[in-house]
């Protein structure tokens, strides 16, 4: 699978918009999840929640799991996806990685969510994940970022099955 992530931070006081883009890796458990969904089966893991983290692997890998990360504190972490997600052909104009054959997950953080400081990694897992629970994907930000009480944020996680 080819995959990308996009973070959009919007300062509600100044109107400034900051966009951070990068690549993430689908884990082995994530490959299984997508295969089961494609076959109409109930997935072994009910991946849905986005976990923001202050530390994680130097290089994301196929075998990463919950224990490889330091999950951040803050209100609404982990976060459920926006209603209607995941979906294909996302029409949110901030999701520049969307497309017909791309599965997009969207997570929106309001001013009241957080605060989150020094976020360097994130992943999608099940609600209440802990220990060595499996994760769908593993992502390392190109640089740390903060979300304070004057900011909203949108996180898009995009996955494209390349068929190879």
Model-derived segments and their meaning:
Residues 1-120, 126-164:
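Small cysteine-rich, disulfide-bonded extracellular modules of the LU/uPAR three-finger superfamily
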């Amino acid at each position: 699978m080819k995959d990308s992530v996009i973070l959009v931070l919007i300062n509600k006081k100044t109107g400034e918009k900051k966009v951070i883009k990068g690549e993430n890796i689908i884990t082995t458990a994530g490959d299984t999840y997508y295969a089961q969904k494609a076959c109409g089966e109930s997935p072994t893991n009910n991946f849905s929640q986005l976990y923001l983290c202050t530390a994680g692997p130097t290089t994301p890998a196929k075998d990463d799991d919950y224990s490889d990360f330091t999950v951040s504190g803050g209100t609404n972490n982990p976060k459920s996806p926006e209603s209607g997600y995941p979906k294909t052909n996302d029409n949110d104009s901030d999701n520049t990685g969307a497309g017909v054959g791309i599965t997009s997950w969207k997570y929106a953080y309001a001013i009241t969510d957080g605060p989150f400081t020094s976020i360097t990694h994130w992943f999608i897992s099940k609600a209440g994940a802990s220990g060595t629970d499996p994760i769908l994907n593993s992502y390392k930000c190109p640089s740390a970022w903060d979300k304070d009480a004057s900011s909203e944020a949108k996180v898009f996680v995009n996955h494209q099955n390349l068929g190879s």
